[in-house]
Amino acid sequence: MSKVSFEDIGAVIATFAAKDDVKPGQMVKITANGEVGACSANDAFAGQAQSVRGGFAGVQVKGFLTLPITGSVALGRVSLAADGTGGVQTATTGGVTALVVSVDAAAKTAVVCL
């Protein structure tokens, strides 16, 4: 158990039109003006869909949040990309620079500041 919690610090959630493939909890990318869709593997993401309703999604685009990870993710400022299954992975090229403050390898999660 962690002695500190970063959850929701600085959270900025913006509303976007959402493609049909967007589900809560998954990483999304900008697909058109004001619209998001699900990420494929290695996509640079815009944020995480927090809620989806009526063709719209609340997307966290800034602040701390816990993300599912694939593979190993280092602490510190790293480049992350979508893993294609809703979470993130270390980017091989490009990606999004984010601050990783905690990694739980057993739970396959990381606390990240976008």
Segment roles from a protein language model:
Residues 1-114:
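Surface-exposed, low-hydrophobicity beta-strand/loop segments enriched in small/polar/acidic residues
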